[in-house]
Amino acid sequence: MCSTPTYCDLGKAAKDVFNKGYGFGMVKIDLKTKSCSGVEFSTSGHAYTDTGKASGNLETKYKVCNYGLIFTQKWNTDNTLGTEISWENKLAEGLKLTVDTIFVPNTGKKSGKLKASYRRDCFSVGSKVDIDFSGPTIYGWAVLAFEGWLAGYQMSFDTAKSKLCQNNFALGYKAEDFQLHTHVNDGTEFGGSIYQRVNEKIETSINLAWTAGSNNTRFGIAAKYRLDCRTSLSAKVNNASLIGLGYTQSLRPGVKLTLSALVDGKNFNAGGHKVGLGFELEA
């Protein structure tokens, strides 16, 4: 069974071509490992080259497969602690229930979220409730699938203000090597994307967006080329003449290097260009 994507995953293939393989203006390192007892550890840290500010986070995950439970704990350098408990595929195939809590020791602030999603081969639905004593905010989404066509709706409702805060629609088509996605957010923001896998080595993507009542149209083209099983090149450009370049090299199994650069084509001689360096380690 091939589950229908969530609303946030609509057009994901096009987004990945634009976003993955880049890390402008920062030095970043990601590390993933797994203990003998099955506990997964993920940590990442990054430092911004323009401000020198550094931050990091640590995540541990433990799965109890017999009961469909996943326990996740998170911590970051802002001293925010998070705990997430998920229960998946036990009450029904494709059903996932999640409790997500956040605690900030410095301020004593506490918050939480209740999440539920149900995914099948022809539809997916989900909801989330932000727990707030002043009045929770309710989020919901649904996606229907039929012969490659996808139609989705996303909303959020602020119970404290009795106001609909988000009202989004999406329509798309998904084939094996081609994807088309369009969306309308709150009746004012319009956008679309096209993803095309030309062959086993080349992926391309086009992104277009504009806002009602504004002449500011955003347009971008991106491509990814796999030189071999270890090396890939990425490039993108938008109508603001910002040119992004990326190079990814698998140095050895579990070790990946990423180099990237952002060039301002309109002000090439003025400087202000950004470079990035990233390491991904997995053991």
Curated annotation (Swiss-Prot):
Any Pfam family matching the protein: Porin_3
GO molecular function: nucleotide binding; porin activity; voltage-gated monoatomic anion channel activity; voltage-gated monoatomic ion channel activity
Binding site for NAD(+): 242-244, 260-264
Modified residues (Phosphothreonine): 4, 33
Modified residues (N-acetylcysteine): 2
Membrane-spanning residues: 26-35, 39-47, 54-64, 69-76, 80-89, 95-104, 111-120, 123-130, 137-145, 150-158, 163-175, 178-185, 189-198, 202-211, 218-227, 231-238, 242-251, 254-263, 273-282
Key words, A-Z: Acetylation, Ion transport, Isopeptide bond, Membrane, Mitochondrion, Mitochondrion outer membrane, NAD, Nucleotide-binding, Phosphoprotein, Porin, Transmembrane, Transmembrane beta strand, Transport, Ubl conjugation
Cross-link for Glycyl lysine isopeptide (Lys-Gly) (interchain with G-Cter in ubiquitin), residue positions: 53, 109-110, 266
Domain notes: Consists mainly of a membrane-spanning beta-barrel formed by 19 beta-strands.
UniProt modified residues of type Phosphoserine: 241
Maturation and modification: Ubiquitinated by PRKN during mitophagy, leading to its degradation and enhancement of mitophagy. Deubiquitinated by USP30.
One GO cellular component term noted in the UniProt record for this chain: mitochondrial outer membrane
Entry similarity comment: Belongs to the eukaryotic mitochondrial porin family.
GO biological process: behavioral fear response; chemical synaptic transmission; learning; neuron-neuron synaptic transmission; sperm mitochondrial sheath assembly; spermatogenesis
Sites of N6-acetyllysine modification: 12, 15, 20, 90, 266
Coarse class of the protein's main subcellular location: mitochondrion
Subcellular location(s) per record: Mitochondrion outer membrane; Membrane
Subunit structure: Interacts with ARMC12 in a TBC1D21-dependent manner. Interacts with MISFA.
Listed name of the protein: Non-selective voltage-gated ion channel VDAC3
Function: Non-selective voltage-gated ion channel that mediates the transport of anions and cations through the mitochondrion outer membrane and plasma membrane. Forms a high-conducting channel with a stable open state and a voltage-induced closure with a mild preference for anions over cations. Involved in male fertility and sperm mitochondrial sheath formation.
Tissue: Isoform 1 is widely expressed with strong expression in atrium and ascitic tumor, lower levels in brain and very low levels in liver and kidney. Isoform 2 is also widely expressed with highest levels in brain but no expression in kidney. Also expressed in flagella of epididymal sperm.
Organism annotation: Rattus norvegicus
Gene responsible for this protein: Vdac3
Catalytic activity as recorded in UniProt: chloride(in) = chloride(out); K(+)(in) = K(+)(out)
